């Protein structure tokens, strides 16, 4: 075999590239997210105040300059939340979503858990002050059932009131900020609001399940890996913003325009500053601003019911629309099956039917390539010293016989959007968390874990997962049934390793995803067994050479 380019080598390279796409695609997908606009460096607070026609607020005197040593912690619990409020910054330092009443264990999540020594969620500060208001010691002025009121007053300057209303029937927190101008001149109060979300212990190894989002005219998103490397800043008009992790979301919509959003990672927590446009308060007057907060599971129908666009977080990304369609189809099917495993099987079967014509075209392409092998080998032998002439004649041969040398890879390429969409749906849809299928498959969002091992093994880890091995076996069978197209023995050996590579990639994938791929392989095997052998029709000049 000549060492120059050959159709067999091209086929192998095409297949290898298809496999590589499945492995590296999540990293490449970030390129499809719109880049956030760079924010100019912020001017010093005092300079900003001068530009606005104001005198900068002078630092307060007395003990305010000292960090409060003992902020009070107020604990609260209702049907949906466990929360701890701190008088330091009038903020939430611990927030737990207790889970759906009908399924507490599967849907419970710790959304934030700080030490209480630093300001927490919903801490606010005025950016034209030289002192950080988020570290001021507020007074708990009123507590009435699910509502809390905190007050901080700077004598002769302003009175700042924060009110929290914790819903016991839906995952909603209503926040009010009241600013009263105690001075004798109109003042501007530019506010930064702090947001925070705790990552789970294993989220550092997952993709697209811990993100920052902001809505301008579309969802701007960045995962925590990108935030760690480059940061995430959005400037311009922002309607709402938030932080996401696997299954859960913290989303905030103010009733005033936000002008910027800066996100940073500290330890295992994402922190963000939502920068609001300045609030103008006349002398002796007060103004109240409202913040609508959702802190709970990422459920499409729930998010859509608010009518503010929160549901768009579930259709973000390059394949976001297809993911949403897949999710809605599974929800519809679930009304009748009551089991998400059967829903996955049903959707896999329907998708296989949809792609059947293209799969048949792929089989036809591979059969033609096999039939053309003698002609291709003849061209290679005649022009082995002239690669340009050899490649030209090979392309003419493909064109004359209407065959695409990469046609055999078509079914694999078509599965990429489905594969990625299934993966993301399994990582976003809380209803699939802990959802069992049959026999040993107890959680479709996790590896199937037939057996737990008493030790950790390389690659395998501490569990024996059977489903990826069944998938690997189905790939070997499918590979045997595919026409090899006269591949040289060394290339056939390389091709034979593809199932092993897939087995390695899929071993720790969610069992729902492996189930989809395994069933797709089984259906392909059945299809190849039922379909009659392809009758290859070559050009009459080439048919006599086969």
Regions found by a protein language model. Give the residues of each.
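Short secondary-structure boundary micro-motifs
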Residues: 4-6, 58-60, 67-69, 95, ...
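Juxtamembrane extramembrane loops of integral membrane proteins
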Residues: 27-106, 150
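Low-complexity, compositionally biased segments
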Residues: 11-13, 50, 103, 108, ...
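Helix-loop-helix
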Residues: 1-47, 85, 177-178, 200-206, ...
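Soluble non-transmembrane domains of integral membrane proteins
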Residues: 73, 77-312
């Amino acid at each position: 075999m000549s060492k120059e380019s050959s159709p067999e080598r091209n086929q192998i390279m095409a297949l290898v590239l298809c496999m590589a796409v499945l492995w590296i695609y999540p990293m490449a997908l970030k390129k499809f997210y719109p880049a956030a606009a760079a924010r100019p460096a912020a001017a010093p607070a005092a300079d900003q105040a001068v530009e606005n026609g104001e005198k900068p607020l002078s630092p307060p005197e007395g003990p305010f300059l000292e960090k409060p040593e003992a902020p009070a912690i107020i604990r609260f619990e209702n049907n949906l939340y466990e929360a701890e409020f701190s008088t330091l910054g009038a903020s939430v330092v611990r927030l737990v979503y207790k889970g759906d009443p009908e399924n507490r264990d599967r849907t419970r999540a710790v959304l934030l858990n700080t030490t209480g020594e630093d300001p927490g969620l919903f801490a606010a500060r005025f950016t034209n002050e030289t002192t950080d208001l988020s570290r001021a010691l507020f007074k708990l002025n009123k507590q009435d059932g699910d509502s809390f009121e905190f007050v901080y007053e700077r004598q002769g300057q302003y009175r700042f009131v924060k009110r929290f209303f914790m819903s016991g029937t839906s995952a909603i927190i209503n926040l009010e900020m009241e600013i009263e101008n105690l001075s004798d001149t109109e003042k501007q109060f530019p506010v930064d609001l702090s947001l925070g979300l705790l990552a789970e212990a294993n989220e550092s190894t997952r993709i697209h399940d811990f993100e920052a989002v902001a809505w301008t005219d579309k969802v701007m998103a960045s995962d925590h890996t990108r935030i760690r490397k480059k940061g995430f800043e959005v400037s311009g008009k922002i309607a709402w913003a938030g932080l996401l992790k696997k299954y859960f979301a913290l989303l905030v919509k103010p009733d005033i325009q936000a002008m910027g959003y800066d996100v940073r990672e500290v330890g295992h927590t994402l922190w963000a500053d939502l920068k609001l446009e300045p609030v103008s308060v006349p002398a002796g007057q007060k103004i109240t601003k409202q913040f609508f907060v959702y802190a709970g599971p990422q459920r499409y129908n729930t998010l859509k019911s608010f009518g503010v666009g929160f549901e768009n977080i579930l259709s973000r990304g390059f394949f976001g629309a297809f993911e949403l369609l897949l999710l809605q189809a599974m929800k519809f099917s679930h009304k009748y099956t009551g089991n998400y495993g059967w829903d996955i099987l049903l959707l896999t079967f329907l998708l296989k039917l949809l792609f059947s014509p293209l799969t048949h075209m792929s089989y036809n392409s591979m059969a033609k390539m096999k039939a053309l092998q003698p002609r291709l080998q003849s061209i290679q032998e005649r022009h082995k010293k002239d690669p340009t002439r050899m490649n030209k004649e090979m392309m003419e041969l493909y064109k004359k016989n209407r065959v695409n040398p990469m046609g055999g890879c078509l079914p694999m390429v078509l599965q990429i959007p489905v594969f990625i969409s299934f993966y993301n749906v399994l990582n976003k849809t809380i209803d699939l968390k802990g959802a069992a299928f049959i026999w040993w498959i107890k959680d479709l969002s996790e590896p199937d874990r037939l057996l737990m091992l008493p030790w950790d093994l390389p690659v395998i880890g501490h569990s024996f997962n059977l489903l990826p091995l069944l998938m690997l076996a189905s790939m070997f069978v499918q590979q045997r049934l595919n026409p090899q197209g006269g591949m040289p023995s060394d290339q056939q050996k390389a091709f034979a390793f593809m199932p092993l590579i897939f087995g390695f990639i899929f071993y720790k994938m969610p069992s729902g995803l492996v189930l989809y791929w395994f069933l797709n392989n089984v259906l392909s095997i059945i299809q190849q067994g039922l379909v009659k052998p392809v009758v290859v029709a070559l050009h009459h000049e080439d048919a006599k050479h086969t």
